[in-house]
Amino acid sequence: MGAAGCSESFLDQEPENVIPESMIYEDKELVLSVLSNLYGRVNWGQNNGDYGSYDQLDEANKCYGSPWVIFTEYDRNSWRVRDYDFVRRVNLFLQGVRGSSALQDSEKKAFEGEARFLRAWHYFHMARTLGGMPLVGDQVFNYESGIDVETYQMPRSTEAGIYDYIISECDEIARQLTEQMTINSARANKWAALMLKARAAVY
């Protein structure tokens, strides 16, 4: 014969396998892991990471170079879903870095420059595909059930306006980033920002 009981606090325990966001930006190594994740999400062109190839202007079909799968119907617009999700992730990162008490000012400057570069690069590829589109800047929108979605609607910028934004961003980014090659040569530096500025100016 035995007895068992429980308390309400049992349901309020924090999961042990999830790091609270409030802790992430108080640890430089965790900040680096978030930045690394952003690099891994960057759109390097007309590819969404599934190794299928797409027509440049029509993602309705994709094909693989294998005899058993040639064409696969693709009936959801995965490209557009990912566009502003990435911008939001960068903006959340910028908020966290700027508000961190664990990072030195020089570290904040460098992290911010890299994240802004990735966002500018992302906008560059979006502009090449879509032309003009809304620019959200550093804003982070937190949608809650019942909110009128029209409050989040933003005017569409012109294509020229997008490239002007990228050029302006790259001028500031170049002042934030080092001229030296980083240990990981894939990370952005001043020259990468100036390269992106030059490419945007061509358009």
Regions found by a protein language model. Give the residues of each.
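Short, well-structured active-site flanking segments
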Residues: A127-V140
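Aromatic-lined, polymer-binding surfaces characteristic
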Residues: Y143, N184-M195
